[in-house]
Amino acid sequence: MQESRSKESTLSGDEDKDVHRFLDEFDDKCTCKLLKEMKETLEGLKKSHPNPTNLDEFYRLFERYLRTRHEKIVWEKIRSPKDRIVQYNEIPEPTEKSKELLRKLAILKLNGGLGTTMGCVGPKSAITIKDGKNFIDLVVKQIRYLNSKYKIDVPLILMNSFNTEGMTDKIIFRYDGIKKFSQSKFPRISSETLLPVSPSHGDKGMYPPGHGDLFYSMKNSGMLEELLEGGYEYLFVSNIDNLASTVDLKLLEYFATNELGFLMEVTDKTRADVKGGTLIEYKGALRLLEIAQVPSNKKSEFTSFKKFTIFNTNNLWINLKEMKKKLEEGFFDLDIIENKKALDDETVIQLETAIGSAIKYFPNSCGVVVPRSRFLPVKTCSDLFLVESNLFVEKNGTLQLHPSRVPETCPTVKLIGENFSKIEKYEKCFKGIPDILELEVLTVSGNVLFGKNVVLKGTVIILADEKSKICVPDGSVLEDNIIYGNLPIIDH
């Protein structure tokens, strides 16, 4: 009887093919119906959209998403890209030629992000970092120093988003010569219907689609053509919150001399970077692999140090002529990242792309393993604590490790809990940022308040019990201390 059931439930090879063919045809019909609904909805949204052609680009992205969303990377086909990875210290020192190449260079800072993870209501670039200066102020200072030193005029370009352009304009009005354009404005889609959320959400129902949008937006805004007509051939791109991403003549000359189309700066992975994208060789091409593309059963392997030892800093060098050529050929179908967000009580999807994934379209591309000193992002209040401290000194707009710091690495800082997750609460925890020149490890959790002129050395762990408070008095020196429990300060 058991054998009979088994035979009844087994399909022949032809029957199995028929089932798959039926499912594929059904899926195609559903996709076509959904695409038709999407097109009709987008036509309605065009009436109120500031740049209706953005929605045509979104439709193309959405169609590609539907066609490819079930495709998975074949883990076994991933190879080490060691033949395409160059060590920074193996690159020749720059010659006089590099100074001439500067005349063909433009600098672009990615400025589309809000500091929402840190509780900011405006662009992250507006956060004050050193001596009353924010990210934009410091970047402008960097460029002015570069231009003054070499008697040139390297332009600064900001790629804003609809979220950041208003406040950014209020910051840059006092600076001359900054070029700018805004990236696309795409509709968020419902995770249930896969159609745009209600227009009643206003701008909350829209989003900037990641920095991979740079290629389309540079072309669409006219910025690409403007740069090429101005004689610029090379573009250095980086995140505006990475104040260590300055122009490096050594990299510029290497990029130009080797006639590369795309160069990605990578650096050695630490425990703080386990989720960062990495370079791989896949199907004969150099590819950026992001954690969102990794199968769930392989994520632990991805975040380990054994197989993937480097990660993407998002400091990128791009040949503008090559970029234009690829755009004219219709390339840059970048890997799509499905980013789920909460909008009121609804789960929505943002279809995003990463600029680094364009590397696969440039056969003449490579990764360069640069020193960690070229990567100093501010993603959390723990990062902000480091750059605000005396660990870094500002020189010509760049943050550099204090010369007295030994070893020449950053301490490990973990500020844990709701008091340190948002800037407003974080700032209330410090009367002054402690001296951390001799700090190795700092972990702070709970309701902890720091007084003025505090010095932290070695390993310091401060853990406040739930519903209790620890106050570190003015002038305290903590060295290799563990403090826990409840320690209020009583004024006398």
From Swiss-Prot:
Keywords in UniProt for this one? Magnesium, Metal-binding, Nucleotidyltransferase, Transferase
Catalytic residues (positions):
K379
Binding of substrate occurs at: G112, G113, H211, N239, I240, D241
* First-tier enzyme category under EC: transferase
Q: Does the keyword Hydrolase apply?
A: no
Quote the EC number.
2.7.7.9
Q: Which GO terms describe its biological process?
A: UDP-alpha-D-glucose metabolic process
Record region (Oligomerization)? 441-492
Record-annotated residues binding Mg(2+)?
K124, D241
Q: Subunit structure of this entry? A: Homooctamer.
PANTHER family in UniProt: PTHR43511
Q: What is this protein called?
A: UTP--glucose-1-phosphate uridylyltransferase
- Which species is the source of this protein? Encephalitozoon cuniculi (strain GB-M1) (Microsporidian parasite)
Tell me what gene encodes this.
Answer: UGP1
